[in-house]
UniProtKB/Swiss-Prot annotation:
<dbReference type="Pfam" id="PF07004">
    <property type="entry name" value="SHIPPO-rpt"/>
</dbReference>
<feature type="repeat" description="STPGR 7">
    <location>
        <begin position="292"/>
        <end position="299"/>
    </location>
</feature>
<dbReference type="InterPro" id="IPR010736">
    <property type="entry name" value="SHIPPO-rpt"/>
</dbReference>
<feature type="repeat" description="STPGR 4">
    <location>
        <begin position="164"/>
        <end position="191"/>
    </location>
</feature>
<feature type="repeat" description="STPGR 2">
    <location>
        <begin position="63"/>
        <end position="72"/>
    </location>
</feature>
<feature type="repeat" description="STPGR 8">
    <location>
        <begin position="334"/>
        <end position="367"/>
    </location>
</feature>
<feature type="repeat" description="STPGR 6">
    <location>
        <begin position="250"/>
        <end position="285"/>
    </location>
</feature>
<protein>
    <recommendedName>
        <fullName>Sperm-tail PG-rich repeat-containing protein 2</fullName>
    </recommendedName>
</protein>
<feature type="repeat" description="STPGR 10">
    <location>
        <begin position="471"/>
        <end position="481"/>
    </location>
</feature>
<feature type="repeat" description="STPGR 5">
    <location>
        <begin position="200"/>
        <end position="210"/>
    </location>
</feature>
<keyword id="KW-0677">Repeat</keyword>
<feature type="repeat" description="STPGR 3">
    <location>
        <begin position="97"/>
        <end position="104"/>
    </location>
</feature>
<feature type="repeat" description="STPGR 9">
    <location>
        <begin position="421"/>
        <end position="438"/>
    </location>
</feature>
<feature type="region of interest" description="Disordered">
    <location>
        <begin position="123"/>
        <end position="143"/>
    </location>
</feature>
<feature type="repeat" description="STPGR 1">
    <location>
        <begin position="21"/>
        <end position="34"/>
    </location>
</feature>
<dbReference type="InterPro" id="IPR051291">
    <property type="entry name" value="CIMAP"/>
</dbReference>
């Protein structure tokens, strides 16, 4: 990389200055003078090196970009000149005086001998500017160098097929639009230009090609005057007159042209219609009604479960002949709760022919049968929690649909104890919401056991629970029968299909309302108790929900004690 850099070895033998310093010992570089323009076209008199000159640098032998001065032809723009300084901001300073090391002064204490020594000069290769770019005839083809170092001129070919200068299209870097004058031409103008006004019509005021139109004029209506092209803005008193005239003109949708295929509407529908808006009698959004009848429109007597008995005469109260409470035919076909007997697996024959049964005489002309509370309780009583039987050990066969890994049937986790859910209404939801979300107050302990737990940060609470005196019943355990020749392994074999032991939840017929709330005719009094057939049965046989709550409270007290 640095092998071609020039090295000056004589600098090590001498000092900073030469031995002999004089007015001819150094060479001051002068700037080259450019050739002045002449009559030759296409910049033919610009400097150009000849092919015979051998230069040390290969880049200096061939003219590079921007070698020719074309600024005089490009920037000679006609127009005004702005007041600006065209001098360069940063000039290249060239000192005319000698530089350091040009003079060779003798050292102090030595004999000064003024002997001038000639310093060898290196021949400087410079470009020859005398040869023009368009050479003379017969010398434009160059020379040929022979083997004996003789130069021989090349002869021109018999025919010249080269393209002349008129066929070249020089491409400049700057477009013509950027070379135009962009200043203010106010100072360059010599006179004022007046705006010429033409008296003729302007563009778009007339149509050259006019089409003949057939004009139909009504005698009763005057022809509109089209010579007024200004905008008409009515005043207040004129706007009132125009609004009154508009009221006499029918609006959109006022006319309803009847078609041959339209259905004639009855006059009763127009009476009940709301008031018309915007003087229009047509409805904007008509309801889409289906032509098919709705479910329950027809009452077929042959397939109906119960047909209401028609009455004629003055026995009908309130001028009503329809039943007060109609029963759904789909609900009558399906069996209700308590319809099946689980113990016998036989459907109760409670469906009777309603036509053969004589209907009792009811009050207020109502034809809907009303049954007593006892009959309703017997008809709709479902199985309670005590009606189900616990599955015994003999019902299930051993090793039925079971697969165990390594023949192990030991249970991995102990069975979870079944907890009974409290009855609905046992908790006060509104009170708990107010205490937790609204007031943010905690209730004091209500029992003695809770007081012990709240004191001393639960230090008085027992660590182990007490022994439960009430043991499990005989049907609590469900033993798994094993084969006699089973191989016991140490690996646990879980069941493939395990049964889901859910928590105990009461059935739909576990709870029932009081007969005073359920029956509409029974009213509670303070002094007199109405005779009811269900009262003696209620004393002896308690409600299964009350039994469940009492047993749950008893187990809860035993659990805390």
């Amino acid at each position: 990389m640095y092998d071609r850099a020039p090295r000056w070895l004589d600098c090590a033998n001498r000092g900073s200055t030469e031995e002999h310093v004089g007015p001819g010992t150094y060479q001051v570089p002068f700037p080259k003078q450019q050739a002045t323009g002449c009559y030759a076209p296409f910049l033919s008199l610009s400097s150009k090196t000849s092919a015979c000159v051998v230069s040390s640098d290969a880049g200096q032998a061939v003219p590079g970009p921007a070698h020719y001065n074309v600024s005089q032809a490009q920037y000679n723009i006609r127009g005004g000149r702005s007041l600006q300084n065209r001098e360069k901001r940063f000039k290249k300073l060239i000192s005319d005086g000698p530089g350091p090391g040009s003079y060779n002064w003798p050292y102090l204490g030595t004999l000064c001998i003024t002997t001038r020594q000639k310093t060898p000069r290196t021949p400087a290769v410079s470009r020859n500017i005398d040869i023009p770019s368009i050479p003379s005839s017969g010398k434009s083809h160059g020379y040929h160098l022979n083997d004996d170092d003789t130069i021989m001129r090349r002869t021109p070919p018999p025919s010249d097929n080269t393209i002349g200068p008129a066929y070249y299209n020089p491409q400049f870097d700057y477009p013509k639009a950027s070379l135009k004058y962009k200043g203010v031409n106010f100072g360059n103008a010599t006179g004022r230009q007046e705006f010429l006004k033409y008296s003729g019509p302007g563009p778009g005021q007339y149509d050259i090609i006019q089409k003949r139109k057939l004009h139909c004029e009504n005698i009763n209506i005057k022809r509109e005057q089209e010579h007024n092209y200004y905008t008409y803005v009515p005043r207040l008193y004129e706007a009132i007159i125009l609004q009154e005239e508009k009221k006499g003109v029918p609006g959109p949708g006022k006319y309803n042209i009847k078609s041959e295929f339209d259905m004639i509407k009855s006059m009763s529908a127009l009476v009940n219609s709301p008031s018309f808006i915007f003087f229009s009698e047509t409805e904007r959004f008509e309801p889409i009604k289906s032509c098919t009848p709705a479910p329950g429109t027809y009452n077929e007597i042959r397939t109906a479960f119960k047909c209401p008995k028609k009455r004629f005469g003055l026995s009908l109260p309130f001028n009503q002949s329809a039943a007060r409470f109609t029963e759904d035919s789909k609900a009558q076909k399906l069996p209700g709760p308590g319809f099946y007997d689980i113990s016998t697996n036989i459907v109760k024959a409670q469906v009777k022919k309603p036509c053969l049964k004589k209907q009792p005489k009811t009050g207020f002309g109502s034809s809907v049968p009303r049954t007593l509370f006892t009959a309703q309780k017997k008809a709709f009583r479902g199985p309670g929690p005590s009606d189900y039987q616990v599955r015994g050990t003999h019902d299930e066969l051993p090793n039925l649909n079971k697969s165990a890994a390594f023949l192990s049937r030991a249970e991995k986790t102990p069975p979870v104890r079944k907890m009974r859910l409290p009855a609905p209404g046992r908790y006060d939801v509104q009170k708990s919401y107010d205490m937790s979300q609204v007031k943010h107050k905690y209730m004091p302990p209500r029992t003695s056991v809770a007081k012990k737990r709240h004191s001393s940060f639960l230090s008085a609470a027992p660590r182990c629970l007490g022994k439960i005196a009430d043991g499990p019943g005989p049907a609590t355990y469900s033993p798994v029968l094993m084969k006699s020749g089973a191989i016991i392994s140490f690996v646990k074999g879980p069941k493939r299909f395990q049964e889901f032991h859910g928590e105990f939840s009461p059935g739909p017929t576990t709870y029932e309302l009081s007969p005073f709330l359920r029956h509409s005719l029974l009213k509670r009094t303070y002094n007199v108790t109405l005779p009811c057939s269900s009262s003696p049965n209620r004393e002896n046989t308690g409600c299964p929900s009350q039994k469940a709550t009492q047993k749950f409270q008893r187990e809860k007290l035993q659990y805390f004690n």
